[in-house]
């Protein structure tokens, strides 16, 4: 009954993946991002992740794979998603939703920590504020974006952008794949010291 839809959806995802694979700069940026995060862990720093909606779920998933395990047993790594409901509702109420991430980073971010900011559009004001706060705190910034990268494109140390101008779910599908690759490379880098 829905086989055509299923095939069409999988085919569309495959086309985006194949196009991304042709972009050598973005492939290099994935490697740079993973090495940057591993270097932070090696130096006893942490990675803080944030995003809105589905990107928020990706930020949480990224952190839980690092504090727990991905494919192999190993020590947990210092990864914190900005996902505390009490914090989000308090800051949203008292300061505004545009500051829910930046206030958290202001509170716990340290020099040489890493912020992984995830935004399919690259234009979410609370993500932009988080990035600006991270820079003030002398943190490194990695962004996972889509479309043309939006406003965050020029605010990051490393940008990984899915150049797709359609529904955001296609971008999110690529983001979760990239997140898993980042974790795989981080684990390999961390093995060099363990």
Curated annotation (Swiss-Prot):
Residues 37-194 form the SIS domain. Keywords: Carbohydrate metabolism, Cytoplasm, Isomerase, Metal-binding, Zinc. It is an enzyme of class 5 (isomerase). GO terms for biological process: carbohydrate metabolic process; D-glycero-D-manno-heptose 7-phosphate biosynthetic process. Pfam families: SIS_2. Belongs to the SIS family. GmhA subfamily. This is Phosphoheptose isomerase. It comes from Buchnera aphidicola subsp. Schizaphis graminum (strain Sg). The gene is gmhA.
């Amino acid at each position: 009954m829905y086989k055509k839809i299923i095939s069409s959806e999988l085919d569309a995802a495959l086309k985006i993946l194949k196009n991304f694979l042709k972009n050598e700069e973005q492939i290099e940026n994935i490697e740079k991002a993973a090495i940057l995060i591993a270097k932070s862990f090696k130096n006893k720093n942490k990675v803080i992740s944030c995003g809105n909606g589905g990107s928020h779920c990706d930020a949480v998933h990224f952190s839980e794979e690092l504090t727990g395990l991905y494919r192999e047993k190993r020590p947990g790594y210092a990864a914190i998603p900005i996902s505390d409901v009490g914090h989000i509702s308090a800051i949203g109420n008292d300061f505004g939703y545009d500051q829910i991430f930046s206030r958290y980073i202001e509170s716990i971010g340290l020099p040489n920590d890493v912020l992984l900011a995830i935004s399919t559009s690259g234009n979410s004001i609370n993500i932009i504020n988080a990035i600006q706060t991270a820079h003030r705190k002398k943190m490194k910034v990695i962004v996972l974006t889509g479309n043309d990268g939006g406003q965050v494109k020029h605010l990051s140390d490393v940008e990984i952008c899915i150049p797709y101008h359609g529904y955001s779910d296609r971008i999110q599908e690529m983001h979760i794949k990239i997140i898993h690759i980042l974790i795989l490379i981080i684990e390999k880098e961390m093995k060099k010291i363990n």
